[in-house]
Amino acid sequence: MRCPFCAMEETKVIDSRLVSDGYQVRRRRECGYCHERFTTFESAEVIVPKIIKNDGSREPFDEDKLRRGIQHALEKRPVSSDDVEKAISRIIYQLRATGERDVKSQDVGRLVMAELKELDKVAYIRFASVYLSFDDINQFTNEIEKLKD
């Protein structure tokens, strides 16, 4: 690997350790020419499937869109940003684990609902009301009753 300071290729790894729950390797490197030290991170490149929309079109998975949707449902709810990030990571992991090139948007919605159900029941109902297109109060009531079981 080239040194970011002098661009020479003579670098050596002086320390390696696992980070991010074992999904990344952090390496400290030293340049053999200028003796500067720098850090690199190595992780496997795993492709997230494309999303098949309701109209049949396909679009790339958008982690920011997922995050915005979850944060919108959790607005003014007592859930830490760390818990939100862990939920997003679990959803992405499950999408990758399918091994499929394409995943239906409904499948992503179900994964989000499952995570929100664990994080915060009010946020779950908020998201479900939009995702499941509630038309009247009875649909809210039915979904709330399911949560009580």
Swiss-Prot record:
Start and end residues, zinc fingers (unnamed): 3-34
Cofactor: Zn(2+)
Pfam families, sorted: ATP-cone, Zn_ribbon_NrdR
PROSITE patterns: ATP_CONE
Domain ATP-cone as annotated: residue spans: 49-139
Domain of life from the UniProt record: Bacteria
Glycoprotein as UniProt keyword: no
GO MF term set: ATP binding; DNA binding; zinc ion binding
Protein name per its UniProtKB record: Transcriptional repressor NrdR
Organism encoding this protein: Histophilus somni (strain 2336)
Record gene name: nrdR
